[in-house]
UniProtKB/Swiss-Prot annotation:
One of its GO terms (biological process) is protein transport. Belongs to the NAC-beta family. Keywords: Cytoplasm, Nucleus, Protein transport, Repressor, Transcription, Transcription regulation, Transport. This is Nascent polypeptide-associated complex subunit beta. Component of the nascent polypeptide-associated complex (NAC), a dynamic component of the ribosomal exit tunnel, protecting the emerging polypeptides from interaction with other cytoplasmic proteins to ensure appropriate nascent protein targeting. The NAC complex also promotes mitochondrial protein import by enhancing productive ribosome interactions with the outer mitochondrial membrane and blocks the inappropriate interaction of ribosomes translating non-secretory nascent polypeptides with translocation sites in the membrane of the endoplasmic reticulum. GO terms for cellular component: cytoplasm; nucleus. It comes from the Eukaryota. Residues 125-135 have a biased composition (Basic and acidic residues). Residues 21-31 have a biased composition (Basic residues). It comes from Coccidioides immitis (strain RS) (Valley fever fungus).
Length: 155
């Protein structure tokens, strides 16, 4: 094999310009330290919190209309100090995802946001209906072939 051709191939394959190859950067996964959780537990013990059993779900309503939903959370409460601690994986969901089972939990503010949501949904339906009507107008340019085949129409 030609030495010049071999040298060109080796040069094109070489990755780094300096000695060796560059170091690869790896993502380090930081484990959540248990010290924060322990500090939180000790401060809650000072408040004399008691666990509350049989809570199926917790929903926190945000001002933008979304809901933070906790399914089967662990809840601890201290009524004299007006402190509630909720543990679990919270998911941010839209109000529409939780509507059937959440209606009895809605307060006056949330009902107003639900009305706004319903109005915006109706407006979207109207806009989609108008878009479909406009789409039907485009179909008028295409001739209808009722009872005939395409070949007979062309001939």
């Amino acid at each position: 094999m030609d030495q010049a051709k071999l040298a060109r191939l080796q040069q094109s394959v070489r990755i780094g310009t300096g000695k060796g190859t560059p170091r690869r950067k790896t993502k380090k996964v930081h484990k959540s330290s248990g010290t924060d959780d322990k500090k939180l537990q000790t401060s809650l013990k000072k408040l004399n919190v008691q666990p509350i059993q049989a809570i199926e779900e917790v929903n926190m309503f945000k001002e933008d209309g979304n809901v933070i939903h906790f399914a089967a959370p662990k809840v601890q409460a201290s009524v004299p100090s007006n402190t509630f601690a909720i543990y679990g994986n919270g998911e941010e969901k839209e109000l529409t995802e939780l509507v059937p089972g959440i209606l009895n939990q809605l307060g006056p503010d949330s009902l107003a946001s639900l009305r706004k949501l319903a109005e915006s949904y109706q407006n979207m339906q109207k806009k989609e209906g108008e878009a479909k009507k406009e789409g039907e107008e485009d179909d008028e340019d295409i001739p209808d072939l009722v009872g005939e085949t395409f070949e007979s129409k062309v001939e």
